[in-house]
């Protein structure tokens, strides 16, 4: 096998990967033209969540820290809007990224409350509790490390419920604390729940990548439990519904680079559930174990809500395995070390593009012994071609005998016929792992390189990098000796750089840059190896 056939194999593997990616990724149907009714903060669930009735609109209060801007509805105390102040909506925009949203076109909310026999969110009440706050807006002041938003509701029986949101400087994790003061003469049975509700169809203003097969990523629910560290649960999976009991874990809604998640913190078993709601919406949530609060006593119930970017180290500190929401696909065990190395290099270099170039040199340097072995094996195979051709003419159509004598020849000449494949087998997972890393790491979102490349996670707007990549492939092809004699294979190999260029037109520019640098390193290593092979009589500069 020579380098020409290796390119053909790469193309086959590449096409296979893209077809698999298209099949594996949950592709939700395009947004319908049906208008979603103005969303209320109703929590309409199945038997698992017991449901909460629809209700009128409460007062909207605003909460702002250095990294978050939230809108909370006093009717139920749900988070209806969330802007991430450190992340622009699109490249070059002054508008912050809009994660949670409640509009006529799209609904994405983080809901929480107390259901159960005596819960204020029990459907039998007819409406959700209307909390009272001391002010309409809250903002983290300079020098302040923590912001508390207390909301109070007093039920008809005199029981006081205080729901407090606690936000910290620089943190995307919110503590949601319930303090229940049972001043009634009867015990209370309450169940804490947290739910993430989202419209299944994306409106045009939020659909930023579904038309690009190379940039399409997972959007849907996920959870972690005692049995599964990380499991996706797509909108289509919700037709069957999730209903499990676990002593640990979290539930989440995911999209590229960003996530929301409820992490139960109350001791005891929790029920995780999903459901399809009305108006084309779906939900994933948790229900804590019921608690009994005796008459005249007080008790606290709480949970943690993550609303923000998928920053691995910060998410891991909030809950075990929450960092796995950074979706690196089935090659996560390669992507994660690659990202750690890339982040380490970025700490010294200060530019993600140059860090990718540096990691390319490191990877190709580590693989140089295998690359050298590959070219040596291919050179020996080329020298055996006359003997193999004579063997074919002598043996004819007896395939079994031909195979036996070929293996005997390889053994006597100390040639491994698969020796040229090993570097390819290793390079392809690294290439695909880098693809997942670029598509899943929020640190690379809108990361500039130089000149016209302002976002390494997006395609080259002028297609210059894919064309340069095709040129480097062409030079590698022209400089590589070949034993391909079949006219069809020769024609395929001639068009291979063009085919790859077309494929890479829509790929992240950071990935294309990696491939360009890798090709340039290949050209340098190729010339160095060929000089050594010439001295051993295993290579000639004349291309046959």
From Swiss-Prot:
It comes from the Bacteria. It is a multi-pass membrane protein. InterPro entries: Membr_insert_YidC, Membr_insert_YidC_N, YidC/ALB3/OXA1/COX18, YidC/Oxa/ALB_C, YidC_ALB_C, YidC_periplasmic_sf. The keyword RNA-binding does not apply. One of its GO terms (molecular function) is membrane insertase activity. Keywords: Cell inner membrane, Cell membrane, Chaperone, Membrane, Protein transport, Transmembrane, Transmembrane helix, Transport. Belongs to the OXA1/ALB3/YidC family. Type 1 subfamily. Interacts with the Sec translocase complex via SecD. Specifically interacts with transmembrane segments of nascent integral membrane proteins during membrane integration. This is Membrane protein insertase YidC. The gene is yidC.
């Amino acid at each position: 096998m020579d380098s020409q056939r290796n390119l053909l194999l790469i193309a086959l593997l590449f096409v296979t990967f893209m077809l698999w990616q298209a099949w594996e990724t949950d592709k939700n149907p395009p947004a319908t033209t049906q208008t979603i009714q103005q969303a209320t903060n109703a929590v309409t669930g199945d038997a698992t969540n017991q449901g909460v009735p629809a209700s009128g609109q409460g007062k909207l209060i605003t909460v702002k820290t250095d990294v978050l801007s939230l809108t909370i509805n006093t009717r139920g105390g749900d988070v209806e809007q969330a802007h991430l102040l450190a992340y622009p909506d699109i490249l070059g925009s002054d508008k912050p990224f809009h994660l949670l949203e409640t509009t006529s076109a799209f609904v994405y909310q983080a809901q929480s409350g107390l259901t159960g026999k005596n819960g204020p969110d029990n459907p039998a009440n007819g409406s959700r509790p209307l909390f009272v706050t001391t002010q309409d807006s809250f903002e983290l002041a300079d020098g302040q490390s923590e912001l508390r938003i207390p909301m109070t509701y007093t039920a008809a029986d005199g029981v006081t419920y205080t729901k407090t949101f606690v936000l910290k400087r620089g943190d995307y994790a919110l503590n949601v604390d319930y303090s229940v003061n049972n001043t009634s003469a009867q015990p209370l049975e309450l169940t804490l729940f947290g739910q993430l509700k989202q419209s299944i169809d994306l409106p045009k203003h939020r659909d930023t990548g579904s038309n690009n097969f190379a940039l399409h990523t997972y959007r849907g629910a996920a959870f972690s439990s005692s049995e599964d560290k990380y499991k996706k649960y797509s909108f289509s999976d919700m037709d069957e519904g999730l209903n499990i009991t676990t002593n640990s874990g979290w539930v989440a809604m995911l999209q590229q680079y960003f996530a929301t998640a409820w992490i139960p913190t109350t001791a005891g078993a929790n029920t995780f559930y999903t459901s399809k709601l009305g108006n084309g919406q779906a939900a994933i949530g948790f229900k804590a174990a019921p608690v009994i609060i005796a008459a005249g006593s007080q008790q606290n119930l709480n949970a943690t809500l993550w609303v923000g970017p998928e920053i691995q180290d910060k998410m891991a500190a909030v809950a075990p395995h929450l960092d796995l929401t950074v979706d690196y696909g089935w090659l996560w065990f390669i992507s994660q070390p690659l990202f750690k190395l890339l982040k380490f290099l970025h700490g010294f270099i200060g530019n993600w593009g140059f860090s990718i170039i540096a990691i390319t040199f490191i990877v190709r340097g580590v693989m140089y012994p295998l690359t050298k072995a590959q070219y040596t094996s291919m050179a020996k195979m080329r020298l055996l071609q006359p003997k193999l051709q004579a063997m074919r003419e002598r043996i004819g159509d007896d395939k079994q005998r031909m195979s036996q004598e070929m293996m005997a020849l390889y053994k006597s000449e100390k040639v491994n016929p698969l020796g040229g494949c090993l570097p390819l087998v290793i390079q392809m997972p690294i290439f695909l792992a880098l693809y997942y890393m670029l598509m899943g790491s929020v640190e690379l979102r809108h990361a500039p390189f130089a000149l016209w490349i302002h976002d390494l996670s997006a395609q080259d707007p002028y297609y210059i990098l894919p064309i340069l990549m095709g040129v480097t492939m062409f030079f590698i092809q022209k400089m590589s000796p070949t034993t391909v004699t079949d006219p069809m294979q020769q024609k395929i190999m001639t068009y291979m750089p063009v085919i790859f260029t077309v494929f890479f037109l829509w790929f992240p520019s950071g990935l294309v840059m990696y491939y360009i640098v890798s090709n340039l390193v290949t050209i340098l290593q190729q010339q160095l190896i060929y000089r050594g092979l010439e001295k051993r009589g295993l290579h000639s500069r004349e291309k046959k």
